[in-house]
Amino acid sequence: MLKPNRVRAAFREGRPSFGVYARIPSTATIELLAHAGLDFVRIDLLENHIGPEMLRAMIQTAHAEGITPFVRVPAVDPQAIRMVLDLGASGVIVPEVESAADVAAAVRAAKLPPHGARRVGLTGLDGHGRVAPDEYAAWASEHVLLGVQMETPGALRDMDAILAMPGLDMVLGGRGTLASHLGVPGQRDHPKVLEAEARLMERARQAGKIISVTYLPVRDPAQVEPVRDWVARGIHSVALGLDADFVHVYRRLLAAVAPAASGERQS
């Protein structure tokens, strides 16, 4: 059934929302993330393969457990955008947009009229007929969010046109991709990358968009401090890495309790 989008709710209440990217194709992972107290999960189809049936099950589990499900699609693909929303996602993340035209195509695919041209296909979110179409449309207009990752030179050049676009709800960085474009591949925390991201986030904030950054504090505890800094600066949403990052916790634990054994396993 229809539930509020926790990212939208947090934004309106003036507090940050927190979540992670999910790459493990498992409903159990979604359940655990919900019980960790996170607000959202971004199921990742860009750097992972999750089939439609598992994707639908993961989205349904998220709704049942009270964690808001987003899906990151592989590209600016209207068919993929419509598919994940018809499966029940409360939001879609579109990576590597190159231009205002890319974002306009995403808006058309993700949004109902008047901003878009999405044709609604309900797959259980309507309670199999218990929710009237007009009620679903009102809910979707309010709670289904479209976010784009502005991580390419083209997107940064078209920044003003993109940020002025009706129907775009959220702007995300992408420091890994941005680092490559700025000539410092692999250096997500290079000053040039951080400066470009901060400039983008401030412009997006001024445009009234939800702004979101991604850090990896489970993988690298030193990144806790930058997250705290963003929170103090009023960031709206933070992705705290990946579901699979738990492996780094056990690597550190193993190194602490049995350093020799840890070294043998890594060699």
PLM features: residue spans?
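Expand to "…catalyze enediolate/carbanion chemistry for C-C bond making/breaking, isomerization
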Residues: 1-267
